[in-house]
Amino acid sequence: MAEVPHHNIPAVDMLNATSRLQLEAQELRNNKPNWGSYFRSQMIQEDDYNFITSFENAKSKEERDQVLAANNANGQAAKTMANLITQVAKDQNVRYVLTLFDDMLQEDKSRVELFHSAAARQKRTVWSQYLGILQRQDNFIVNQMSSIIAKLACFGTTRMEGQDLQYYFSFLKEQLKNSTTNDYMNTTARCLQMMLRHDEYRHEFVDSDGVQTLVTALNGKTNFQLQYQLIFAVWCLTFNADIARKAPSLGLIQALGDILSESTKEKVIRIILASFVNILSKVDEREVKREAALQMVQCKTLKTLELMDAKKYDDPDLEDDVKFLTEELTLSVHDLSSYDEYYSEVRSGRLQWSPVHKSEKFWRENASKFNDKQFEVVKILIKLLESSHDPLILCVASHDIGEYVRHYPRGKTVVEQYQGKAAVMRLLTAEDPNVRYHALLAVQKLMVHNWEYLGKQLDSDVQTDTVAVK
């Protein structure tokens, strides 16, 4: 298993990162519920009362360990936590119990086994007791419970799996999607950091489109601490070779590259470079590795590496990463063909007016290559026409579909077969005038047979438009 190894990159910081959850938890620790009143009113059982008060009154870790050991045989600790969390009506007191529970696990990771053992004796999983709490209305309760679930899933030897794991990742993804309204985003990110350090959980996260959710969150407006936490989660994913192999097609490299080109925080730069090193070193297939490297080059990573190389760092890991990436990326651009560059750009989904798009020589020599891998490039261009909302991407994709049809005899048939003609025609009514213009040119190329006449006609139209603008 590809667990996260020792590295100078900081581990999950559960104590020092200031978050709303931690600030509220600190207040709760100073406001113990009146358990005596609950007991006298028969709202909690005597066993629960005895355990919770004994644990609260313990003054040291040693004393708390003694309380837990004395109640281990009958699983009282697990029973009491479950009973108080699910049966106490007052949210304020449930918040307190959850904070106590979280502190209990944070103080000693091995304590999670008490809860797994108790659940096993009842022939159930610990998750079945607590996943339902994630549907509560109180946001603190929900997020503190999420933090506890992550610890139960990571600190011990029992791993979450199946529908329980799917449900939990689905919850975390929804929390990430609500980044503008979620005041506990740092807690969500920390849960992901913990979970994705374990290889058993990575594939399920990727298979459930978790990477797309991460990329969207990274592309949004996030503060520095949250940005670092999310990139940490990506870094954990890249330790898995299968996931690293998919990185070029998942949008990970572009998202990290954009941040790298703008970030001045060494902490962020360090972990992005470490992620890039993982991607290039975990992939064996030459073509995939080269595509990943080209995407990094397109994100101006080489320029960042040059600036970093001029500085002196005390961190040997960072120096090694800079050296490795510089060598790999420099090698990738050596003898780079124009089609390699174009292919990488299309695969990234981030089209722009790079020189190849307007090069007659490029289209004459490479149009037939669009048919490789079952018309992969054609399919990607059509998908961009159907799904992108970026006017620049729509303009370039329309142009390229038209040029493919113009230079490949059977291009019209291929484009129509994959609904490309319909996709282009829908853009004739786009709001952006440039999109409408390039869509119109593409439609004309799809319909006209006399390319020489069309070329002269288009030149004439452009000249007329230019005169009109003047």
Curated annotation (Swiss-Prot):
Similarity remark: Belongs to the V-ATPase H subunit family.
Subunit-structure text: V-ATPase is a heteromultimeric enzyme made up of two complexes: the ATP-hydrolytic V1 complex and the proton translocation V0 complex. The V1 complex consists of three catalytic AB heterodimers that form a heterohexamer, three peripheral stalks each consisting of EG heterodimers, one central rotor including subunits D and F, and the regulatory subunits C and H. The proton translocation complex V0 consists of the proton transport subunit a, a ring of proteolipid subunits c9c'', rotary subunit d, subunits e and f, and the accessory subunits vah-19/Ac45 and vah-20/PRR.
InterPro entries reported for this sequence: ARM-like, ARM-type_fold, ATPase_V1-cplx_hsu, ATPase_V1-cplx_hsu_C, ATPase_V1-cplx_hsu_C_sf
Organism encoding this protein: Caenorhabditis elegans
GO CC aspect terms: vacuolar proton-transporting V-type ATPase, V1 domain
Function, as annotated: Subunit of the V1 complex of vacuolar(H+)-ATPase (V-ATPase), a multisubunit enzyme composed of a peripheral complex (V1) that hydrolyzes ATP and a membrane integral complex (V0) that translocates protons. V-ATPase is responsible for acidifying and maintaining the pH of intracellular compartments and in some cell types, is targeted to the plasma membrane, where it is responsible for acidifying the extracellular environment. Subunit H is essential for V-ATPase activity, but not for the assembly of the complex.
GO MF annotation: an example: proton-transporting ATPase activity, rotational mechanism
Keywords: Hydrogen ion transport, Ion transport, Transport
SUPFAM superfamilies: ARM repeat
Gene this protein is translated from: vha-15
UniProt cross-references to Pfam families, sorted A to Z: V-ATPase_H_C, V-ATPase_H_N
Name used for this protein in its record: Probable V-type proton ATPase subunit H 2
